[in-house]
UniProtKB/Swiss-Prot annotation:
Organism: Bos taurus (Bovine)
Endoplasmic reticulum recorded as keyword: yes
Assembly information from the UniProt record: Forms homodimers. May form a heteromeric complex composed of ERGIC1, ERGIC2 and ERGIC3. Within the complex, the interaction with ERGIC1 is direct. Interacts with ERGIC1/ERGIC32. Interacts with ERGIC2, the interaction is required for the stable expression of both proteins. Interacts with MARCHF2. Interacts with SERPINA1/alpha1-antitrypsin and HP/haptoglobin.
Protein name: Endoplasmic reticulum-Golgi intermediate compartment protein 3
Region (Required for MARCHF2-mediated degradation): 1-25
Classification via Pfam families: COPIIcoated_ERV (PF07970), ERGIC_N (PF13850)
High-level lineage: Eukaryota, Metazoa, Chordata, Craniata, Vertebrata
GN (gene name): ERGIC3
Intervals, Cytoplasmic compartment: 1-25, 363-383
Membrane-traversing stretches: 26-46, 342-362
Site keyed Ubiquitinated: positions: K8
Annotated positions of the N-acetylmethionine modification: M1
Glycosylation sites: N266
Length: 383
């Protein structure tokens, strides 16, 4: 018993008799308020614990032979779909001209609304649907190229064949109405119908995972002496307005928390025949979810440059929107992990202990202040 008596001396929490305890309205108010605050802080801590945290790691990218998926949704309010070409090429030498096999073009009116609910989809290398029945023509015919014949081009049986022959010669294709093939296919009518329209380009590209570029530019694209050029001879440079709105642009799949810096970018061309260049640095990214799902995607940063393209070729540039991308040799690995349960318990204990301590100090201050004031009032009454 004597040992127990000595042990009691170490009690840091001495108890008072129930008869000596005083309950006040101020103490009740402090208890209720502190209890509510404690509950709110606990719920906040619980919500934080239930979320996952992401741990970033940096590695050398050792992947080889992969494809790079580029998601695109861009609006050109003053560039008709019939005038616009989309091309992609990489430093490996692979060039995909007029790439549309995974892209759609949707015609827009002058107010930005779709002309029709259906979008145009053109397969790469696929002949477009004509306004006449091609079966009505002799399949063995050999029509004129109107003076643009070459050794490898003897016959021009379509408007596109004539345009190609003219481009090979370097001639301007200015008056398609004088060419029977174009008049038969309604080429001028198609161009005139879309003259004051805009165009929405959306879909995705799949390119080699090496540095390269893709661009949106007016005129038909083609190769001339191993150089990529666009036929702008039938366009007036003063009529080319490359104002654009990038609704979405990303490289790969989205993951939680991703930021695509070009999303919702609206750029107004200050004058005609502008060349916009976006220099993009792509960082390969692997995102691992807590359930084991692995997303292989990319992040990117970007800078923009713009200038007036006064020429059709050469150093003066080409009117259009160009996205030039490079791939980083480093890869970012983002791993989702559950938060530590011990940290959660520590936080809850800190909340409870801290609130009890602060509430006790406030209650003591209120109680002793009220007693001091009451004593002064009582002394005033006796005198």
């Amino acid at each position: 018993m004597e040992a127990l008596g000595k042990l009691k001396q170490f009690d840091a929490y001495p108890k008072t008799l129930e008869d000596f305890r005083v309950k006040t309205c101020g103490g009740a108010t402090v208890t209720i308020v502190s209890g509510l605050l404690m509950l709110l802080l606990f719920l906040s801590e619980l919500q934080y614990y239930l979320t996952t945290e992401v741990h970033p790691e940096l590695y050398v990218d050792k992947s080889r032979g992969d494809k790079l998926k580029i998601n695109i949704n861009v609006l050109f309010p003053h560039m008709p779909c019939a005038y616009l070409s989309i091309d992609a090429m990489d430093v490996a030498g692979e060039q995909q001209l007029d790439v549309e096999h995974n892209l759609f073009k949707k015609r827009l009116d002058k107010d930005g609304f779709p002309v029709s609910s259906e979008a145009e989809r053109h397969e790469l290398g696929k002949v477009e649907v004509k306004v006449f029945d091609p079966d009505s023509l002799d399949p063995d015919r050999c029509e004129s190229c109107y003076g643009a014949e070459m050794e490898d081009i003897k016959c021009c049986n379509s408007c596109e064949d004539v345009r190609e022959a003219y481009r090979r010669r370097g001639w301007a294709f200015k008056n398609p109405d004088t060419i029977e093939q174009c008049r038969r296919e309604g080429f001028s009518q198609k161009m005139q119908e879309q003259k004051n329209e805009g165009c929405q380009v959306y879909g995705f590209l799949e390119v080699n995972k090496v540095a390269g570029n893709f661009h949106f530019a007016p005129g038909k694209s083609f190769q001339q002496s191993h150089v990529h050029v666009h036929d702008l001879q039938s366009f007036g440079l003063d009529n080319i307005n490359m104002t654009h709105y990038i609704r979405h642009l990303s490289f790969g799949e989205d993951y939680p928390g991703i930021v695509n810096p070009l999303d919702h970018t609206n750029v107004t061309a200050p004058q005609a025949s502008m060349m916009f260049q976006y220099f993009v640095k792509v960082v390969p990214t692997v995102y691992m979810k807590v359930d084991g799902e692995v997303l292989r995607t990319n992040q990117f940063s970007v800078t923009r440059h713009e200038k007036v393209a006064n020429g059709l070729m050469g150093d003066q540039g080409l009117p259009g929107v160009f996205v030039l991308y490079e791939l980083s040799p480093m890869m970012v690995k983002l791993t989702e992990k559950h938060r530590s349960f011990t940290h959660f318990l520590t936080g809850v204990c800190a909340i409870i202990g801290g609130m009890f301590t602060v509430a006790g100090l406030i209650d003591s201050l209120i109680y002793h202040s009220a007693r001091a004031i009451q004593k002064k009032i009582d002394l005033g009454k006796t005198t």
